[in-house]
């Protein structure tokens, strides 16, 4: 209740202890500030349901700069709404900080979010291919590859896209997992595992309860702001 549109959410690799949740990654290419705040709320509740020991997740708004004056009108209005909310909003975050754990939940519209996701996927694929080519270039490089094999296997495992298969269609009264059509059986198994974890954590009921509480707090803040603006308008007239 209170969610206008569902969003595609996905956990991304991070150098921090926990993964980073990003949404929307393509379901809604054009969003209002209110809808982006809704995404922040449902992302916040999902993260808390899956990582209760983490506490209040840090919410970041994906933008072209960290300053609050940066971005489109929609993004700047969203910034103001998130700042006045009871969420743990840490401000704007640039795309180069997404994989460094600067925020636990990253919010964007589906247009920007999908471009970010595809850029990350492309960069990982490019770097993997470039490393492979360099190690196969000559005999010396091949010998170096043998020595570096344990580290390379660890890196490959950490960045394996199949491990992150299974995007969540968040904001519905049910568990919906969207799998990548080009993945293999291992990728599908991770998507099924994601569905299992969501069902086991009872995330739906927790999200519904949390969303209701956050919306009630947000409406109270809006009412207070409207009253203050009305009072200021009256004082200006006098």
What is the meaning of each model-derived region?
Residues 23, 88-93, 108, 166:
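General beta-strand structural signal in soluble alpha/beta enzymes
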Residues 20-32:
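Low-complexity, intrinsically disordered basic tails/loops
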């Amino acid at each position: 209740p209170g969610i206008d549109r569902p969003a595609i959410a996905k956990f991304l690799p991070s150098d921090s202890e926990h993964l980073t949740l990003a949404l929307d990654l393509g379901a809604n290419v054009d969003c209002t500030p209110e809808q982006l705040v809704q995404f922040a709320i449902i992302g916040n509740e999902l993260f808390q349901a899956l990582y209760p020991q983490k506490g209040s997740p840090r919410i970041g708004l994906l933008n072209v700069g960290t300053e609050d004056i940066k971005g489109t009108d929609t993004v700047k209005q969203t910034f103001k709404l998130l700042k006045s909310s009871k969420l743990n909003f840490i401000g704007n975050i640039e795309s180069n900080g997404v994989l460094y754990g600067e925020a636990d939940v990253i919010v964007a519209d589906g247009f920007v979010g999908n471009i970010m996701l595809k850029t990350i996927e492309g960069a990982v694929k490019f770097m993997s291919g470039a490393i492979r080519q360099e190690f196969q270039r000559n005999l010396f490089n091949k010998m170096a590859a043998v020595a570096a094999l344990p580290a390379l296997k660890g890196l490959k495992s950490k960045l394996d896209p199949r491990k992150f298969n299974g995007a969540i269609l968040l904001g519905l009264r049910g568990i919906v997992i969207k799998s990548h059509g080009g993945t293999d059986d291992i990728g599908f198994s991770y998507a099924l595992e994601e569905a299992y974890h969501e069902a086991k954590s009872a995330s739906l009921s927790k999200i519904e309860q949390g969303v209701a509480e956050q919306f009630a707090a947000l409406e109270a803040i809006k009412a207070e702001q409207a009253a203050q603006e009305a009072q200021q308008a009256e004082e200006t007239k006098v």
